[in-house]
Structure formats: structure tokens, C-alpha cells
Amino acid sequence: MLGWIVGTEWFPYAVKVTDDANRSLAPYSGKYFRATAEATPFESWLASMLEVLAKKELEYAWQHPVALSNWPTTDPLSHPDEANEQEDLVSVDPMHVEPTSAWKAGYFASYHIYPAYPDFMRYEEKYQDYRTVEGKSDPYAGYLNELRAHHEGIPLMTTEYGTSSARGMAHRGFLGRNQGMHTEAEQGRINAELLDDIYDEGLDGGILFSWQDEWFKFAWNTGDLEVPANRRPMWLNRLTNEQNYGVITEPGESIEETIHLDGKTDDWDERTGSRSGFGGLVERLSDRLLGRVPEVRQRRYEDFDLSVSHDEAYLYLFLQKREGEWDFPDEEINVGFGTLPGGSTKADKAPGLTFPGGIQFLLQIRGEKGSHLWINSAYDPHTWLYGEQLGHMPDPVIEKDPRAGVFLPWRLALNRPLELPQSGRKIPFEDYEVGRMNFGITDPSDPEFDSLADWYAEGGVLEVRIPWTMLGYTDPSTLRVWDYPYEAGKIEAVRNEDLRVYPAVQSAGNGQISVEPLTYAWKGWDQPTYHERKKKSYTILSEVFEDHDRVKTPLR
């Protein structure tokens, strides 16, 4: 037990309502803590809460250092170019609360500070103009510098800092310090840079967020696609940045059942029962009887075999040629996915192909730089919400008929349109293509490991993994997908018993092809399986921590 941090990231409107309703409240004065004459009613109430804590501690003959939780949204600084009213609406100032001489353990200021939010971190000129001691532009360091100056006389700690190794992203940050879409190695590098800033600006410590990934978290741009919300802990959404901040990852499945995209077949052999020998057969049958084996479905096509499997985070595809090697871009692989009855039997992105039964998504593998996952326009929640409902997208393509065959880039929002109040600068709506499929190896022991990779091909082996949300699943543990948003008028989850997978290989002169599906179904689950692994960021940070084992005197 090192100390107490009291409170949470204060909701600014709750602070304002409290202050407005209690303007006649006198500053609190207790035996161990008091509010200063400048304290707001909310700050005075916080002083009284520290008093409650202090008295409780002393019942056990203890005193520990204490702080009030805070974050940039309710900091005591001024941010005149912050576009979102609530991000600079009120202040909660730790300097307006102080310990009395009876409290010996100390009092410090605590802030959760991330580099990509609020927007003033990215657009406020005073932070953009700030230079570190090395002469580099660094808004995060600029903010820390101003915060340190305000809290003169008391210790100041960044009690949350970090970045996410999610496959998805929620916000862009300066210097590429985005909320998500970082490899594990990039996560380690950025976290090391943030710690350097905390150290160089003379703060008294930093606590990394977080130790491990947290499946239960949600983010503003994916939360509506996770239904029901109370089942988030059952599966890992790799598109939700908030779930992937840890330096310890918890991939779905046991370590023995993990599928790596690496061009090798041993992991798939383990799942499909292709282990050699009588012993392997007996072990496999035993595993199946005990329910320890993930589902796998297989189907033979003209020139290749398809296997499909899954875990708590991904759907996996394994396509193996019976002769020869995959040849991109001379060959093109298109895989349609039918998550609901109906959909389009044609796709404008894949002329010449027919998908009986209809599809909502189309995976297109053309090579390392030209591969995408497309979404049926009528099924696209992004264009429905930000194009039709809110009008944020310029000239959105809106085709409400799921049979029309219009497929769009799979996109996620990053920010709504902004107008900066001081400069008058207008910032347009921001989004990005999450459906751009990344080529790479996902085996952590491989020197070429890429934690953001979606597919890999080597020789006659092609492997793909797709996060569940990118295939329309709101909860794979109960086989729920979202319904057509234009028809439902909202994001509504419906149950679908199976997934139709339509693989096709096209090359010059193929002509018309009608693709028969592999139908994939699986049992739902109420107990997720996972294992723990140290991310690459863990090793990077463990080395950096050795250089920051003491408080540094500010360089300025």
C-alpha cells in the first residue's frame, strides 16, 4: 500500500451542477484536511472526503499519502481553443485543498494524462509551440510543463499514461501518438517517450496504464457495436482501443490452441486433428469428448482447401493450394461473408462473382499493399450514422438496398467536426479505413512479428484473421450480429445461427464464377478461454524503467 487516490475522472457537468447548487457553502475545515478560501463547493466537498479517509485510516493507526483524482478535462488550466465545451467547462484544483499539520503522511496532485485527448492537446497553440530541452515540438511535454508550474509546492504525479496496441483507433494524436492502431513495439516506444516527458518536466512519478488488457472496456466509436454491453468481458474486441492498453495481452484460446499467421500448418493441424500417429488420434478424440477443441469447418474447392475456425477475438481462414504457390497480384482472392439472411449476390468490387444466399462483407486479397475488407452499403453503420443521420460525411455513398451490390470501405470515426473557439479554425470530420488489411506474421517469437497483421501468405498457404466487429458481430459468444441499420433505424443486435463463407480465386480469363459457401457455426460460450503473454512493449518499458528510478529536478 503506497497511498490513496480519491475519486474518479470527474464528469464536468456533475461538478458544475454541484457548484451551482451550493454556492453559499463555506470552505470545509477538518482536523486533517481543509479547503482554502478560493475553493469551490465541489472542491470543499472533496476536502471533506479526504477527512473521512484520514479518520478511517487512523482507526488502524496508519497514515498514507493521499491525492484527489483528476484529469485534463477538469484541470485548473485555461484552454481557450478547446472546441468541446465540457473539456474546459470547470476546474477542480488540488491547490484549493490542503492538509493540516496533523496530517503527516503528505498530499499530492494526481492526473490521468494521455497524449491524444482532449483535443486541446492536439490544437492548442501554446502546446504546439512548446519545445523540449532537446528542441523538439512536443505538446504532451508542454502540457506537463504548465501543469507542473501550477502545482508549485506539492508533488505532482501522472497516475495514468499510456497508449493502446489495438487493431482499431479512436482518436489521432500529435507525433503519431494515436489512441490505438500501434504495434506492440510502437506501443512500447511511445510509452517510453511519454515517461521521458514526465521525467524531464520534473513531475514526481508516473503510473503506466495498464498492466493487462481489459476486455470489459468500451470506446466511443465502437461501443454501440458491442451489444449486449454486459457481455463485453466474454470476447476481445481488437477494434476497441480501450481494451488493449496493457503490456500483458490475453489472447483468446489456450496457448496450445493459438493460431499464428506464419505460413505454417502445425497450428491448423492441431485443430483439425491432422496430428500423425495413433496417439495423436486418441488424444484428439479425448479432447473433443471433453469439449477442449475449437470448432473447425473444412471444404474442398477446385484448386484449394478452405478451413475456418475462431477464438474469442478473431475469425480465422486457412486456404491451402493443392498445387503450386499463391501468386499476387496475378491472382486475386475474394471471400464473401454472409452474416444475415439475404444481402447481395453480386459485389461491385468483385465483378464476375456470384454469391448465392447473399453477403454483407467482401474480403479482397490482392497483395501486400492492395488488400481490403469491404462492407455492403446497406449494412454499413458508419455511413448510416455519420453520413445519413448526422450529416458529417461529405458526399457519402448511401445505398439502402442490400441487394444492390454496392460495397464501401470499412471505416471508423475518429472525431466529429470541430470549430476551435479562439482561432475560428474549422476541423472537418475525421475517420479512417479500418478495413485496410495488413500483411504480416503474428507469431510473437518471429523476428518479423507484427501484432497488427491481418493476413499472411507463404508458398501455397494463406492465413487470415478478422476481428469479430469487422464481420458485423456485436457478441460472438451469443452469435449476435447487428441488423441492417437503415431498416432498423438504429444499431440493433439479432441472433444469427451461422456464417456463410464464399471463397473464390480469380485470375485473368476466369469469366463468371458462382461460389458455393462453407457454412460455419459454433457453440456460444459463457466462459472465455485465454492465456497471458508479455507484449513487446513490456520488454521495452522494463529497460526504460531502469533509467527513471528517481525523481528528477526540472531542467528549466
Stretches found by the model and what they are:
Residues 1-12, 41-63, 89-101, 193-201:
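An active-site-proximal structural segment forming one wall of the substrate-binding cleft
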Residues 1-40, 61-72, 204:
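Active-site groove signature of glycoside hydrolases
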Residues 4, 53, 109, 160, ...:
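Conserved, mostly hydrophobic/aromatic
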Residues 17-44, 123-135, 169-182:
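A solvent-exposed, charged loop/short amphipathic helix patch at secondary-structure junctions
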Residues 87-175:
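Glycoside hydrolase catalytic-domain groove-lining segments
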Residues 173-176, 186, 197-274, 282, ...:
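Aromatic-rich peripheral "rim/lid" segments of glycoside hydrolase catalytic domains that contact
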Residues 263, 313-322, 460-468:
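Short, well-ordered beta-strand segments enriched in hydrophobic/aromatic residues
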Residues 274-279, 287, 295-420, 478, ...:
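Surface-exposed, glycine/proline- and aromatic-rich loop segments on solvent-exposed faces
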